[in-house]
């Protein structure tokens, strides 16, 4: 069986009862994480969110779904687009490192918008178990396509694989038959957004590609359910996703994972910092050296990071004057300088004063990223770091796994620290009672009667 047929069969037949306790727990955790990250995107540190919000309203009126935090009513397509931008706009959303896919950024906004729309338009509320199942379907489709790639990315895989997965997830949310689900995925393929050019330039359009992918998934479902006929061999056909967009691919590992019924949410990593994931290990190592050795920024002569080629491709870009926050989030030299001055990189690390700080620029110019011999085009580990001090010391540290990954998972306390850090940066204040209510609901997501009740907790009504 090809991966195409295996994935579609999996998406059409997976049931809540098939999921392990570990998969259900991981779903709760990453729904919590992704919602919190999206809520933080409403804050002033992501000003372009207002542009996306205005565009969503200009593209059409509707009341079937809502914007997170601020609560404006929108068509499901508009809500998916806006909330998708909020989730990915600060590089703080979770990532499936083997696939190099940020699955939840596209998937969760699309599924939540579709769930609200189904309840509002058809009086058919979507419960927590259905949402959990649909999220797992979507993440499995997105990431199993991603792990099949064998060449460096040319197209923005998080948006593309995310759209394909989200379309399958929405179809599962509606309990669609196998034929309709297939049409939804195929129609999503017809709308795939995103190249790596936005990443190379550090453009905020990178997150917009995720937003458009989330919108495309909802659009695909609405066409599919009405019977619109798409091309069907869109994953492995002559001009299907894998041969056209990825070029080199091997579906063997994905087929093996499906045969073993391995939930891909168990392979998803938290983002510990609001930066590119390829920069996480470097920040983590420098934080250790800073604390262990009592280092100050003035003590450092140079920093050398030994890393796989993907790290160099994604985050070894130079510091430059007047860089945008979207560029700085992917600029490892700037991020390491911020670690030395602030202790860690948080959501407030990208203000104009910090971006123009000459001390950061000075250290950034003395950071090098060099190959470590890895030939895996998708690997982010292992990595090692050598810091040379002005008094001649050579300090070294290494990581076999990235912080937040399944091999080095965040503790519950660290997860809650991130949750609260995100809500602290939302556009409207979330008091302790609202935060606890939201956490209680998320911790019992499988007991949720209606996804709209969860969205209610994401919104602060104006006083």
Name each model-derived stretch.
Residues 99-105, 130-135, 151-163, 206-212, ...:
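Active-site nucleophile and cofactor-binding loops and adjacent substrate-binding regions
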Residues 118-132, 175-182, 229-233:
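Structural helix-adjacent loops and short alpha-helical linkers that scaffold large soluble proteins
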Residues 148-153, 200-201:
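Membrane-interface helix caps and helix-loop-helix hairpins in membrane proteins
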Residues 1-100, 205-215, 222-463:
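Terminal-appendage/accessory-domain detector
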Residues 86-145:
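Hydrophobic alpha-helical hairpins/lids featuring a short glycine-rich hinge
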Residues 72-91, 130-145, 180-191, 244:
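Short, charged, amphipathic alpha-helices and their helix-cap/turn boundaries
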Residues 39-41, 111-120, 167-173, 220-223, ...:
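Well-ordered alpha-helical scaffold segments within catalytic/enzyme domains
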Residues 104-109, 157-173, 183-253:
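Amphipathic alpha-helical interface segments
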């Amino acid at each position: 069986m090809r991966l195409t047929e295996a994935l579609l069969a999996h998406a059409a037949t997976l049931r809540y009862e098939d999921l392990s306790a570990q998969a259900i727990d991981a779903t709760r955790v990453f729904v919590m994480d992704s919602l919190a990250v999206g809520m933080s995107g409403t804050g002033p540190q992501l000003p372009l969110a207002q542009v996306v919000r205005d565009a969503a309203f200009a593209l059409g009126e509707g009341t079937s779904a809502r914007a997170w935090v601020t609560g404006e009513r929108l068509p499901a397509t508009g809500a998916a687009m806006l909330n998708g931008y909020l989730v990915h706009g600060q590089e703080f959303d979770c990532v499936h490192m083997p696939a190099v896919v940020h699955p939840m950024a596209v998937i969760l906004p699309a599924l939540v918008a579709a769930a609200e729309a189904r309840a509002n338009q058809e009086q058919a509320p979507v419960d927590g178990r259905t949402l959990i199942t649909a999220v797992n379907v979507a993440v499995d489709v997105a990431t199993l396509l991603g792990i099949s790639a064998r060449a460096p990315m040319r197209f923005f895989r998080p948006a593309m694989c995310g759209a394909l997965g989200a379309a399958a997830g929405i179809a599962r949310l509606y309990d669609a038959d196998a034929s309709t689900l297939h049409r939804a995925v195929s129609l999503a393929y017809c709308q795939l957004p995103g190249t790596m050019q936005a990443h190379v330039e550090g453009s905020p359009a990178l997150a917009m590609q995720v937003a458009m992918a989330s919108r495309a998934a909802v659009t695909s479902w609405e066409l599919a359910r009405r019977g619109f006929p798409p091309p069907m061999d869109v994953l492995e056909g002559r001009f299907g996703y894998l041969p056209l967009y990825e070029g080199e691919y091997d579906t063997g590992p994905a087929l093996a994972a499906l045969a073993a019924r391995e939930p891909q949410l168990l392979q998803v990593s938290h983002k510990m910092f609001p930066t590119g994931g390829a920069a996480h290990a470097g920040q983590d190592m420098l934080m250790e050296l800073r604390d262990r050795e009592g280092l100050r920024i003035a003590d450092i002569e140079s920093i050398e990071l030994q890393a796989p080629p993907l790290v160099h491709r994604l985050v070894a870009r130079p510091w430059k004057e007047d860089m945008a926050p979207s560029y700085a989030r992917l600029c490892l030299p700037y991020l390491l300088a911020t670690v030395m001055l602030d202790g860690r990189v948080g959501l407030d690390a990208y203000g104009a004063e910090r971006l123009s700080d000459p001390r950061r620029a000075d250290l950034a110019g003395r950071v090098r990223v060099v190959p470590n011999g890895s030939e895996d085009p998708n690997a982010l580990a292992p990595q090692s770091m050598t810091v040379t001090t002005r008094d001649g010391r050579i300090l070294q540290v290494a990581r076999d796994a990235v912080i937040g990954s399944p091999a080095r998972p965040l503790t519950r306390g660290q997860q809650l620290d991130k949750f609260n850090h995100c809500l602290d940066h939302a556009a409207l204040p979330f008091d302790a009672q609202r935060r606890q209510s939201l956490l209680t609901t998320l911790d019992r997501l499988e007991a949720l009667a209606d996804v709209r009740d969860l969205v209610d907790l994401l919104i602060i009504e104006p006083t």
